[in-house]
From Swiss-Prot:
InterPro entries (UniProt xref): Ribosom_uL1_bac-type, Ribosomal_uL1, Ribosomal_uL1-like, Ribosomal_uL1/biogenesis, Ribosomal_uL1_3-a/b-sand, Ribosomal_uL1_CS
Keyword RNA-binding applies: yes
Pfam families linked: Ribosomal_L1
Gene Ontology annotations for the cellular component aspect, listed alphabetically: cytosolic large ribosomal subunit
Family of the protein in this entry: Belongs to the universal ribosomal protein uL1 family.
The protein's name in its UniProt record: Large ribosomal subunit protein uL1
Keywords in alphabetical order: Repressor, Ribonucleoprotein, Ribosomal protein, RNA-binding, rRNA-binding, Translation regulation, tRNA-binding
Superkingdom in the source lineage: Bacteria
UniProt subunit comment: Part of the 50S ribosomal subunit.
Residue pairs linked by disulfide bridges in the UniProt entry: none
Main function: Binds directly to 23S rRNA. The L1 stalk is quite mobile in the ribosome, and is involved in E site tRNA release. Protein L1 is also a translational repressor protein, it controls the translation of the L11 operon by binding to its mRNA.
GO BP annotations, alphabetical order: regulation of translation; translation
Keyword Ribosomal protein among record annotations: yes
C-alpha cells in the first residue's frame, strides 16, 4: 500500500467525511490545505441537480455573471463586422473579425477563452464547429454568446461570466474564484450561480432540484456545502 503524503495525511485528518460545511468553513479549509504550487489553485463548485440529463428538456445550460469575477484574465474573440466591430473593440474585445478571424482559427490560432458572434456572423462561425465545439468555444444563444448586443456580451465575459451545462450525470461544474478570494466573495459568487440555477429549473424536473453542492480546489478535496448556509 502506497504511503500517504503529508498533504494527504492533512486532508484525512482535517476533513470530516459526511459533514456539510458552511461556505466560510469550506473556503478556510481549502485555503489551509492548498498545495505549495506555482499557480493559484482555483476554487470550483459542482452542483448535482435532480434532472434526467438524458432528456433534452431537462438539460440545464446557461451562463451567470459572477459578482466578484473568477480571478482570471479572459481573452475574448468576436465575430462581427461594421458598427458592431467598433462596439466590440470599444468594449475591450481582444480579437475582432469575420472571414479573416475564421482563417486564423482554421490555422489553429486559438488565443482566446470566449467566442462571441452576432447573428449575421454565424454563417462564418458555423464552418468552425469541429474546431470550436470540442473546446467549448462555439457561440450559443442560450449562454448569450450569439447576440446583437456585442458590447454587453464582451463586458459580461470580461467581468467574469461563467458558462455551464449539465454533464451526463446531471452535474454542473463551474469556477468560483481562487484560494486568494475571501470567503465572502466565494459565497457571493456561489449564491449568484445557485439563484440563476433556480430560475432555469426545467419544468419537467421532479423531486429535489438542488441535490448536492460541493466546493473543491484544484489539488484539494471536495467539501459538501450546507445549503442552509446560503442566502438563496
Amino acid at each position: 500500500m502506497a504511503k500517504l503524503t503529508k498533504r494527504q495525511k492533512a486532508i484525512r485528518e482535517k476533513v470530516q467525511a459526511g459533514k456539510a460545511y458552511s461556505v466560510e468553513e469550506a473556503v478556510a479549509l481549502l485555503t489551509e490545505l492548498s498545495a505549495p504550487v506555482k499557480f493559484k489553485e482555483s476554487i470550483d463548485v459542482s452542483v448535482n441537480l435532480g434532472v434526467d440529463a438524458r432528456k433534452s428538456d431537462q438539460v440545464v445550460r446557461s451562463s451567470t455573471v459572477l459578482p466578484n469575477g473568477t480571478g482570471k484574465t479572459v481573452r475574448v474573440a468576436v465575430f462581427t463586422q461594421g458598427a458592431n466591430a467598433d462596439k466590440a473593440k470599444a468594449a475591450g474585445a481582444d480579437i475582432v473579425g469575420m472571414d479573416d478571424l475564421a482563417e486564423e482559427v482554421k490555422k489553429g490560432n486559438l488565443d482566446f477563452d470566449v467566442v462571441i458572434a452576432t447573428p449575421d456572423a454565424m454563417r462564418v462561425v458555423g464552418q468552425l464547429g469541429q474546431i470550436l465545439g470540442p473546446r467549448g468555444l462555439m457561440p450559443n444563444p442560450k449562454v448569450g454568446t450569439v447576440t446583437a448586443d456585442v458590447e454587453a456580451a464582451v463586458n459580461n465575459a470580461k467581468a467574469g461570466q461563467i458558462r455551464y451545462r449539465t454533464d451526463k450525470n446531471g452535474i454542473i461544474h463551474a469556477p468560483l474564484g481562487n484560494v486568494e478570494f475571501s470567503a465572502e466573495h466565494i459565497k457571493q459568487n456561489l449564491e449568484a450561480l445557485i439563484a440563476d440555477l433556480k430560475k432555469i429549473k426545467p419544468s419537467s424536473a421532479k423531486g429535489v432540484y438542488l441535490k448536492k453542492v460541493t466546493l473543491s480546489s484544484t489539488m484539494g478535496p471536495g467539501l459538501l456545502i450546507d445549503q442552509n448556509s446560503l442566502a438563496v
